[in-house]
Structures are given as structure tokens and as C-alpha cells.
């Protein structure tokens, strides 16, 4: 299209701006343009949105005779500011995962153009975020620094406030083309819209069905509403899939069509290859890992194992390393090993091995407090007494009536005492169940996946010492593993976007993982999870294998994909409860339907909770009992 604009329409290439998502993409597009036209026509301008924003800020500097803040290019600097803000406001030390989550949340807020008074910590999903966010921005301004997101915020402000600067860029770039538009954020779309307002020449290429970066503030609504946003706009649908075989395209298309916020499309495979979609039934995660281990040993040709979260790969990596089977791992992330849940469990193990360690006890006592029931003062008193008398802390707790809580204290002491007689996986399960750490996790809304992964690794080791050493070795493997080009590849779905593989295995397709926790509470987020599943399926060229763990009923997305193949995958509308109907949920008890929207119902439970569910999933998992209408006292 760029070549046509320049060669056939006589448009000056200097007046064409093509915006791509990353710096690498600008280079790639420039090379592809040159390979097409071999220098026969001049090169148009390829830029990232941040590069464009730098130009806006520099022009502002020249016109106003001022100097902009310095750009922070090192994440360690912004990470240090976040760390200090966290310590100040949370009175605790952040983990690697905490800093990463806050970094992502800061970028999200700026890209979504959210004002500080328009959101809460719960909206963002990060405890203490608003105070840390303010601290972070104040420190940047104090040091006359800006981050990459600030570049866009400042450039947008300049373009809005100074028509002269906006006109300069509108005159310069009369034609704007945007690649990968589904990954573009709200503020980026606003900047692009400002620049195109004068000339009205905008061309976007994107697929809202592949918008999977909502946590980075990707804004697929701009594509869905393209005709409303831009006068005289036209949408052309690309409905041919050039990668995947027929059955894969059929299943993937059948799943994604359940999303509402999209342009209606009917994808067709160009390939004449029928291909295969298989559902591999296993009894649970451990059986899934063993199946993948067999696959790694016997696979032929390029094979990828895809998963939602980096940590899903850890038990599999553990097995592959033990068996010395070569594999590649794309974009490794070792945040699992510094996660609070993992650190807590390891601290309990270390305390059990040295039950006189007062520092460790003070770090863990309140996390197993459903059994200990100690105030901070009591915990400190027990530590002081242990130090003074030379006894262990469990001995002090059992002997002193000030700290003893009936049988519970003895249970705690017994679990700690038996650390080296229990198998590692068994001991972790006892910490979770018997010592009440699971209750603490539930109160903190921590997902159970990390405990399950720890137990998966622990069950491969004979002694606690072996387990602790293995965790150290695994962390080194995960953090330092390089992509080495072998044809058995492990990757998150996000890292696999834009790539393709002959054969794909999708692991951990479970409610709570993919789709992730609490997605039924928000249909919009649930649709993004479905898009992620769609992207995962369409990485496969010839064969797609989806694990069906069958632990507590089939996963929502497994049901949808299997339903497309069997012809029984239509959304269930029959017998959907109406407003005022009474229902009985096997977990939450009795409640009243207060809203119904398509497949989704919102229920106010008698216990005080209000939750949103997919009726189809409730029915298929046997979680729902229907009662009579509550209206008019019936």
C-alpha cells in the first residue's frame, strides 16, 4: 500500500508516517519496504509512537526556549523509586513481582489517561497503588525525569494546548498508517487522532481478536469503533488465515465468535491441509507434565508448549532438566522464585529446620495465625523468652499458658518438629492445610497455582535438603536459560504472538489460570482471556493439542473448543435465569438474580456477596440449582 501511495498516487513519501509498535518493527518494515522496491522509490517515514513524541517535545523545547525532563531509559532507576515508595507506604520490602506489577500498573494508568481521582487500588488490583503512584510521579518531577509513558502524556498535552505545534506535524505527515493497531493504547490513539484531524487520512491494520495486552492498556475499542471515531471511515475485513490448517481455523473461529466486542468475521483457512485438533485427557497437572515429558522425548519437528503464566513451565522445566532433554525457553522470567507465597513456604521450611530463629518466626507467624492466634506482642514475647531460655519457639509456645492455644499450639509444634521426617511435598501440603497458610492465601486473594507448582517440584525430591537445593538450581536455570534454537519450545502465549509452530500443545487450560481468576466478574476481561486462547490456538500450523485436565469439570475454554468440533458449542440460552429468579450455587449458597445479560447473570447472594457468572459454565459444571422466582415474595 505504501508503494502504491508513492508510485501510483504520487504522494510525497516525506508526508507519509507509518507508526509501528516497537523499534524492531520499524527496522523490519523498512527492510521489507526496501526488499519490495529495491530503492526504486524513496523510503517513507517509519517511527514508533514514542519516537514521534520525542519530536513533538523537541519542537516544544525550541519554540518555548525550555528544556524537557531527561528520559529514564534504565528500568533499574524507576524500579528503585518504586521500591522506595513501596517501603515508605507499605512498611515492607517489595518482591521482584511487586515491583513488576506496580511498573505495569503505572504504565496502564498513564496509557489509559486515568486521573488520580478516577480509580482506586481495587480498580488497579495493586494494594497501596495510589500512594506509590503519587510517590513515583513526585520523585520523577523532583529529579526532572520522565519515563517512556510520560513522553506520550507530555506530547499529547502539547498537541492539545499548542495548535501551532499540532499544525506543524499535521502539515508534515498528511497520511498516517498504523500497524498492529490492536496493541495501541488509548493515549496513542488520541495522539494519532489529533494528528489526522486536519487531513483525515488514516489507515490502520489490526485485529481486535488478537488484542491481548490489556494489562499494558491496549485499546481494541478504537478498532471496534473505527467508523464512529473517524468520519467517512471504511472497514475492510481480512478473513483468510494463511497459517493454520482447516480444523484449527474452524475451532479457533468458533471460539472467538463468542466475543461480542468485535467486527463479525468468518475466518477461512487458505491451507488445503485438514490438520488436527486433539484434546488430551489427563487426571491432573502431574499427569499433564508427564505427557509433555513423553512428547519432548519423542516429538518430530518444531513443537511448542504454550501457557498463560511463566510459572506453569517450572515443573516441566524441572522434569526436562532431570532427563537432560534439550529445550528452548522464550523470554524467561524468574519472578516466581521471589513471589511472596514461594518465599513464605521456604521460610516456614527454614524455620522448621531452625525453630529458634526469631527473625524467621516474626516473618511467618501471622501468616499461619489461624492456628497460632498470636498478637504481635505475644509473638515478640515468645521470641524473647526463647532467646533468654535457649528453648525453641515451639517449645516456648507449648509451655507458656500466655501463648498456648489448646491443641492448636501442639499441632503447630508437631508439624514443625516433623519437617525432616515428611516428604517435601507432604510437608508443604501440611503448611497449607494444617497450619492454615491456605486460609491466609484465600484472605489475601493469592491464587493456589504457586502452591501447586511448589508441590509438583517437591514431589520429585526425596528429602527437604534436596528440595531446597533443587529450588536454587531451578531458579538459576529459569533466570539464565537462553533461547538456543532447539525445536522443542516453551513459551507464554504473549511471547508467542506473531510466531508459528508446526505442532502446538496448550497446557494449564483451567478456570483460574486461562481464563484467569475472577474473569466471570468482568465480561470485558473475560473476552480478553478468550482472545488470548484464540491467539494460542492460531499459533499452530498443522496440529493443535489442548490438555483437558478434568479435575473439577472441563475448563470453560476447553468446553467451547470441543463444542465447535462436536457441533454442541453454541451458547446456551435455554433456561437462563431471569431477574428476580432465585438460584442455589453449590459454593456460595442461595441468592437472587439481579441482572441478566446474554449468557451472563449477576447474583446477589444471601450471605452478602454479589458475583457475575457465565450461566453456561455454571450449568455444565453442575454448580447451579434453580429455585422459584423471588419476585412478589414467591
Predicted regions and their residues:
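C-terminal accessory regions
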Residues: 509-615, 620-634
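Conserved helicase core region in the C-terminal RecA-like lobe
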Residues: 45-55, 177-180, 205, 309, ...
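P-loop NTPase Walker
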Residues: 1-67, 167, 250-253, 597
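ATPase/helicase motor core of nucleic-acid motors
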Residues: 274, 297-422, 438
Amino acid at each position: 500500500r505504501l508503494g502504491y501511495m508513492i508510485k501510483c498516487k504520487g504522494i510525497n513519501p516525506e508526508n507519509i508516517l507509518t507508526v509501528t509498535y516497537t523499534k524492531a518493527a520499524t527496522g523490519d518494515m523498512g527492510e521489507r519496504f526496501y526488499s519490495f522496491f529495491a530503492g526504486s522509490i524513496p523510503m517513507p517515514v517509519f517511527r514508533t509512537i514514542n519516537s514521534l513524541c520525542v519530536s513533538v517535545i523537541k519542537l516544544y523545547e525550541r519554540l518555548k526556549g525550555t528544556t524537557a525532563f531527561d528520559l529514564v531509559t534504565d528500568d533499574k532507576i524507576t524500579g528503585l523509586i518504586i521500591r522506595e515508595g513501596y517501603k515508605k507506604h507499605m512498611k515492607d520490602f517489595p518482591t521482584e513481582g511487586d515491583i513488576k506489577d506496580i511498573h505495569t500498573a503505572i504504565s496502564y494508568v498513564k496509557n489509559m489517561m486515568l486521573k488520580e481521582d478516577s480509580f482506586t487500588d481495587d480498580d488497579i488490583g495493586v494494594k497501596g497503588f495510589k500512594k506509590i503512584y503519587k510517590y513515583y510521579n513526585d520523585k520523577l518531577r523532583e529529579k526532572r525525569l520522565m519515563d517512556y509513558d510520560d513522553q506520550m502524556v507530555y506530547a499529547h498535552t502539547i498537541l492539545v494546548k499548542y495548535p501551532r505545534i499540532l499544525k506543524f506535524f499535521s502539515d508534515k505527515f498528511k497520511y498516517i498508517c498504523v500497524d498492529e493497531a490492536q496493541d495501541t493504547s488509548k493515549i496513542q490513539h488520541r495522539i494519532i487522532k489529533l494528528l489526522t484531524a486536519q487531513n483525515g487520512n488514516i489507515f490502520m491494520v489490526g485485529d481486535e481478536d488478537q488484542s491481548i495486552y490489556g494489562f499494558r492498556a491496549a485499546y481494541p475499542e478504537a478498532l471496534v469503533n473505527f467508523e464512529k471515531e473517524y468520519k467517512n471511515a471504511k472497514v475492510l475485513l481480512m478473513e483468510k488465515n494463511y497459517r493454520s490448517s482447516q480444523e484449527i481455523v474452524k475451532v479457533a473461529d468458533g471460539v472467538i465468535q463468542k466475543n461480542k466486542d468485535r467486527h463479525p468475521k468468518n475466518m477461512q483457512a487458505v491451507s488445503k491441509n485438514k490438520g488436527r485438533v486433539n484434546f488430551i485427557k489427563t487426571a491432573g497437572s502431574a499427569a499433564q507434565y508427564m505427557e509433555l515429558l513423553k512428547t519432548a522425548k519423542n516429538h518430530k519437528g518444531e513443537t511448542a508448549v504454550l501457557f498463560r503464566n511463566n510459572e506453569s513451565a517450572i515443573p516441566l522445566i524441572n522434569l526436562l532438566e532431570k532427563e537432560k532433554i534439550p529445550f528452548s525457553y522464550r523470554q524467561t522470567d524468574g519472578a516466581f522464585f521471589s513471589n511472596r507465597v514461594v518465599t513464605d513456604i521456604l521460610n516456614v521450611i527454614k524455620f522448621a529446620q531452625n525453630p529458634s530463629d526469631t527473625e524467621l518466626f516474626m516473618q511467618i507467624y501471622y501468616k499461619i495465625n489461624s492456628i497460632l492466634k498470636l498478637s504481635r506482642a505475644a509473638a515478640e514475647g515468645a521470641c524473647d523468652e526463647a532467646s533468654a531460655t535457649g528453648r525453641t519457639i515451639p517449645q516456648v509456645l507449648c509451655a507458656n499458658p500466655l501463648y498456648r492455644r489448646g491443641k492448636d499450639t501442639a499441632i503447630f509444634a508437631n508439624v514443625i518438629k516433623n519437617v525432616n521426617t515428611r516428604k517435601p511435598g507432604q510437608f508443604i501440603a501440611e503448611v497449607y492445610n494444617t497450619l492454615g497458610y491456605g486460609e491466609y492465601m484465600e484472605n489475601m486473594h493469592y491464587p493456589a497455582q504457586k502452591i501447586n507448582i511448589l508441590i509438583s517440584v517437591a514431589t520429585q525430591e526425596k528429602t527437604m535438603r534436596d528440595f531446597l537445593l533443587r529450588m536454587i538450581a531451578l531458579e538459576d536455570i529459569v533466570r539464565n536459560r537462553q533461547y538456543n534454537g532447539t525445536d522443542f519450545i516453551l513459551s507464554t502465549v504473549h511471547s508467542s504472538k506473531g510466531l508459528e509452530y508446526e505442532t502446538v500443545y496448550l497446557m494449564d487450560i483451567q478456570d483460574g489460570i486461562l481464563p484467569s481468576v475472577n474473569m466471570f466478574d468482568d465480561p470485558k476481561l473475560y473476552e480478553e482471556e478468550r482472545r488470548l486462547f484464540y491467539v494460542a490456538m492460531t499459533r499452530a500450523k498443522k496440529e493443535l493439542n489442548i490438555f483437558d485436565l478434568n479435575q473439577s469439570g472441563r475448563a470453560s475454554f476447553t468446553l467451547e473448543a470441543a463444542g465447535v468440533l462436536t457441533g454442541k458449542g453454541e451458547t446456551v440460552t435455554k433456561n437462563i435465569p431471569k431477574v428476580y429468579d432465585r438460584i442455589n450455587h453449590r459454593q456460595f449458597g442461595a441468592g437472587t438474580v439481579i441482572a441478566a445479560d446474554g449468557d451472563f447473570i449477576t447474583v446477589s447472594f444471601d450471605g452478602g456477596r454479589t458475583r457475575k457468572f457465565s450461566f453456561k459454565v455454571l450449568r455444565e459444571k453442575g454448580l447451579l440449582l434453580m429455585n422459584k422466582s423471588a419476585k412478589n415474595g414467591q
